[in-house]
Amino acid sequence: MSSDAQEASDDRRKYEFRKVIEELRDFEGSGTQLVTIYIPEDRQVSDVVAHVTQEHSEASNIKSKQTRTAVQDALTSIKDRLRYYDTFPPENGMVIFSGAIDAGGGQTDMVTRTLESPPQPVESFRYHCDSAFLTEPLEHMLEDSGLFGLIVLDRREANVGWLKGKRVEPVKSASSLVPGKQRKGGQSAQRFARLRLEAIDNFYQEVAGMADDLFVDKRHELDGILVGGPSPTKDEFLDGDYLHHELQDKVLGKFDVAYTDESGLKDLVDNASEALADQEIVEDKRHMDEFFENLHTGEEATYGFDQTRRNLIMGSVDRLLISEDLRSDVVVYECPNGHEEYEVVDSRHSTPSHECSECGEEADVDEREDVIEHLMSIAEQRGTDTKFISTDFEKGEQLLDAFGGIAGILRYSTGV
């Protein structure tokens, strides 16, 4: 499998995992009756079955009949699932969720989900029984890779934060007491200059303290530190060895940034694109910049479900751009006269009625599926790459808000 094909496969699998995790996270049990089991790849299935059998036996001591029955039913369902596996679980292990969830009106529904081969290996065996499924370890596996420290400063203010994968996270800020260059009456120029230099030095120490508090404990996980601001501020700060000595070697570079508030952290990431060339957020921005450039020429760009789908079917889409935050379904309607039409609806909403635009007849629902999976299936058949775009930068937000979360960069202009 080529690297692009492998990346597309990994992205799709991550999306499918994320979708299931979001569903599981919303489930609640009426008591402590939702069971989660994390199984590493080197744990023998027979050992897990023995553990589940033991838990089933111990559950007979639960006083509440409802909870006792629910827990034992969940464990029985898990044992049934484990019968489908040989000696060991799949690569990277697996996670099984089972339990009676609250369906409202005093009713419950029994659900069992199995997630095989997560993006990262399951580190240890874990049995968990609570009123909610344990999804946090899986959520951590899906976090974007790459961890960078961010510092922006001038002589008025400073902000410190993280770049985690595609997300810029402001964490700490400070305002300086550095006086302006004009001295107050009665002060000698020499005394004023000395006081000003002391204030600058104190402020740099404060900024370094914020950075040290945030970054030192994470220094072994850090991929680098980026420093931004106007000259000579950022130069003085770095040349003055204010940062902790173990952080100084992590500095990837200094970059000119016009703003030093929270928005300056995003500007810093933009301006450090060469240093971050292999990071996902830079790739996202490159795709969106190309999309907007093509859109402004009126040629090799498409957006929205209908136009993008038509171009996908034609095989003209080079890259399908999907917002990571898109949560919609596509409903396929068919009228009595055989006309087929599509409508995109929020995944949380019920299926609306539909009148055929061609003949006016009431149309029946033929199918409803996740809009991303629908489009990705066509893309795979046509050799189109799919890119998931973060909303943690302006053009990524625009993809979701202005274009419905769906767009494409075309191989050639189609007029569609």
From Swiss-Prot:
Indicate the quaternary assembly: Heterodimer of two subunits, one of which binds GTP.
Lineage of origin: Archaea, Methanobacteriati, Methanobacteriota, Stenosarchaea group, Halobacteria
Q: Which GO terms describe its molecular function?
A: translation release factor activity, codon specific
Q: What is its main location?
A: cytoplasm
**NCBIfam families xrefs:** aRF1_eRF1
Q: What does the UniProt keyword field contain?
A: Cytoplasm, Protein biosynthesis
Classification via SUPFAM superfamilies: L30e-like, N-terminal domain of eukaryotic peptide chain release factor subunit 1, ERF1, Translational machinery components
Asked whether the keyword Mitochondrion is assigned, the reply is: no
Q: Which PANTHER family match?
A: PEPTIDE CHAIN RELEASE FACTOR SUBUNIT 1
Protein localization: Cytoplasm
Protein's name in the database: Peptide chain release factor subunit 1
Native source organism of the sequence: Halorubrum lacusprofundi (strain ATCC 49239 / DSM 5036 / JCM 8891 / ACAM 34)
The family annotation for this protein states:
Belongs to the eukaryotic release factor 1 family.
What this chain does, per the record?
Directs the termination of nascent peptide synthesis (translation) in response to the termination codons UAA, UAG and UGA.
Record-linked Pfam families: eRF1_1, eRF1_2, eRF1_3
